Amino acid sequence: MNPDIDDTTAALRALRSQSRLDKATAGAWKRGLDWLLSMQNDDGGWPAFEKNTDSPLISSLPIEGADTVSTDPSSADLTGRTLEFLGRYAGYKENDAPVQKAVRWLLARQEIDGSWYGRWGIAYLYGTWAALTGLMAVGVSPAHPAVQKAVDWLTRQQNADGGWGESCHSDEQKMYAPLGASTPSQTAWALDALIAVHPRPTPAIERGIDYLSRQSQAADWTTAYPTGGGRPGGTYFAYHSYRWIWPLLALSHYQSKYASAS
């Protein structure tokens, strides 16, 4: 098994500033970037671990969960997050060949309602966040019909308290299922996507910011609800850092983007 695509982009993000200061880090950063680009699937998307392992023969093996654990196809979340890295940290834009292929792959896999399914997080909120932030990072216009359709979908899913929440049932039934309550991580994903698209804060964004601010000290079940994906219908993960990491990132993006615009 190869290293993890998502973890590689996370490490490269952390190394980017230092890579401009010393040759050793610059060399490591370049090797990581080259490996990341080499892992792009032939269809244009990115997998989690293994390149071009989406054979229908493998997924039909008489093994429980073979359709999800025996293959590693391109996914909207990995493709979107890789695009976000390439655009924000590596200077890649819409006319670069790897980006063109990935954007085409993403646009072709948008759901009819405007969302994207995310494989490694729950689920349509996660995938839509990754797709939108990736598309914005490489220069796709916020006015693109696919972007606007996704924004409309996200806005419709916002709860009365200003947050967002999606059930793990979405992952199993491959159809958006509201949780009935908001979670910090899923709110942060939706909010971060809207921030990436809009040049100025919208009412939906402000309501989401207010929710995160109110919930920063919450300690109920919504802060521990599993929002990490594993095997659909079988395994889900509650990452304890998610309630802090994703809200902090969304809040920092809100501050850095809109403070100068106000």
Predicted feature descriptions by range:
Residues 1-262:
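Preference for long, amphipathic alpha-helical scaffolds in soluble/luminal domains
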